[in-house]
Amino acid sequence: MAAAGAGPGQEAGAGPGPGAVANATGAEEGEMKPVAAGAAAPPGEGISAAPTVEPSSGEAEGGEANLVDVSGGLETESSNGKDTLEGAGDTSEVMDTQAGSVDEENGRQLGEVELQCGICTKWFTADTFGIDTSSCLPFMTNYSFHCNVCHHSGNTYFLRKQANLKEMCLSALANLTWQSRTQDEHPKTMFSKDKDIIPFIDKYWECMTTRQRPGKMTWPNNIVKTMSKERDVFLVKEHPDPGSKDPEEDYPKFGLLDQDLSNIGPAYDNQKQSSAVSTSGNLNGGIAAGSSGKGRGAKRKQQDGGTTGTTKKARSDPLFSAQRLPPHGYPLEHPFNKDGYRYILAEPDPHAPDPEKLELDCWAGKPIPGDLYRACLYERVLLALHDRAPQLKISDDRLTVVGEKGYSMVRASHGVRKGAWYFEITVDEMPPDTAARLGWSQPLGNLQAPLGYDKFSYSWRSKKGTKFHQSIGKHYSSGYGQGDVLGFYINLPEDTETAKSLPDTYKDKALIKFKSYLYFEEKDFVDKAEKSLKQTPHSEIIFYKNGVNQGVAYKDIFEGVYFPAISLYKSCTVSINFGPCFKYPPKDLTYRPMSDMGWGAVVEHTLADVLYHVETEVDGRRSPPWEP
């Protein structure tokens, strides 16, 4: 059994070696500063109106000249053969086949070659109409397709077009994302330029575009420029997190901003606002009719050739400029909570009065007032990317964490202040000489130390089942290891001061800009907080092992907001399940899954923000009366 009082980052009794991990940060010191106020062309309709190309004994009859005039050079396919129509420049493929049956239910089959009709906007699999898909890929967008019901000839119409680099990158990332979802235990959302994206495009070049493969290998550099520029579609991460074991040569990594692959489709100019294709993220390469034109793509030309009418004032508005977040709801590059400071991602508060006052000359060059912003919350409970030791590696889905060297900790994105709550952790890998301490922590718990090191956290250790609080270890149960599923229950009374309080609005805090995002900066007063801690009667923490209640671990714990927390020693790997479905749901008590705190926190913070504006004089920048 380890000696009580082990130091930060150090497994008790294991020696000081691996524990000496210096604090790291994802920010360069000079990059944080106070913030001062201050479509691809659609396919031509002339093609669809051309005389129909009827299947014949290997020849394209009638309408050949018209197709050549419009497209410049097309390949015509039929069920009996393939002929090449000679023309200049771009080569494309067109097909008219006898109709199969229209998919009445319009069901999607992601991962298959699907085609969207440019008139009715319904989706069909290519096999429905017997279309040759040997030169096609799933999630392609460089085509024009009319189903047999919509096309004037009564036949299906399919034209494969030349793809630009943006469309090729979009298709490649969509296919890589789908493959990872279906094949990997922990799906990835970001992919290496050299190891994933370039090899995929090189392998499937002929399937992705009708353009000839270039003789010079300059296109890999061009796709990097394309994805780095198209930030309304692609995510870019140029370097690994500080302390990460990811090799630098795997970067830059790219991913899709919108992870809903069903949004990917061709940019038809007659697409209706009520169509099945979502305009989220502009993944279809254009802005659908009826779109408001908001977001980063708003400055580009609309489908009718005009501009969005965005004024100079709107472009320079620092408050409501679009702030696009990755699929998991947090910027890829961000400041870490460290050195006595905490950072809360901010977004414009739509309920703030008079946001246009920033346009007044008197505000030029001055910091943006914090009451015009609010804490940016994600509706899912996940592991926090910023509220962790930088050396810990978090998976793309933010549900798995891998340890590194000495003990260090990560907290969840949401905490609880009252009621009974539960979550599970599965030990995926626990090699010899590794360990874990799992449990609950308040926001001020030391991230560069094992859970249970200070007064703000309570933990259960894998070795010998020891429980820890204030670095004092006591026997609790048998230990746990690889393959075990552990449950964590907490019950906090409803009548405490913390339980009756609304969450902090942070509106009286300074706004800090880092990598194009704004954050509230909050100073930690650990010593003052420790002295003000008081025990909460009738509160308790219980741990479970493979569905078996191990007994009450702690009673009358300190009052505060508690977050699910994980601390790992060396290369241990665990996955967390916030619910609502658990492998071993407790049957001996009532609880709510931690996943319920996702929307619960949104409601609480919204109420706090609205009350702030109602009860506080905005120009005075005074804290709400319920805050100390």
Curated annotation (Swiss-Prot):
A zinc finger (PHD-type) spans 1-66. The modification Phosphoserine is found at residues 101, 316. GO terms for biological process: DNA damage response; hemopoiesis; positive regulation of cell population proliferation; response to estrogen; transcription initiation-coupled chromatin remodeling. Keywords: Acetylation, Chromatin regulator, DNA-binding, Metal-binding, Methylation, Nucleus, Phosphoprotein, Transcription, Transcription regulation, Zinc, Zinc-finger. GO terms for molecular function: beta-catenin binding; transcription cis-regulatory region binding; zinc ion binding. InterPro entries: ASH2 (IPR037353), ASH2-like_PHD (IPR049455), ASH2L-like_WH (IPR053835), B30.2/SPRY (IPR001870), B30.2/SPRY_sf (IPR043136), ConA-like_dom_sf (IPR013320), SPRY_dom (IPR003877). Residues 36-65 have a biased composition (Low complexity). Residues 67-177 are annotated as: DNA-binding. Residues 235-252 have a biased composition (Basic and acidic residues). It is found in: Nucleus. The modification Asymmetric dimethylarginine is found at residue 296. Residues 1-18, 283-295 have a biased composition (Gly residues). Residues 1-107, 235-331 are annotated as: Disordered. Its main location: nucleus. It comes from the Eukaryota. Residues 316-628 are annotated as: Interaction with RBBP5. Gene3D superfamilies: 2.60.120.920, 3.90.980.20. Residues 270-282 have a biased composition (Polar residues). Signal peptide: none annotated. Transcriptional regulator. Component or associated component of some histone methyltransferase complexes which regulates transcription through recruitment of those complexes to gene promoters. Component of the Set1/Ash2 histone methyltransferase (HMT) complex, a complex that specifically methylates 'Lys-4' of histone H3, but not if the neighboring 'Lys-9' residue is already methylated. As part of the MLL1/MLL complex it is involved in methylation and dimethylation at 'Lys-4' of histone H3. May play a role in hematopoiesis. Interacts with HCFC1. Core component of several methyltransferase-containing complexes including MLL1/MLL, MLL2/3 (also named ASCOM complex) and MLL4/WBP7. This is Set1/Ash2 histone methyltransferase complex subunit ASH2. It comes from Homo sapiens. The gene is ASH2L.
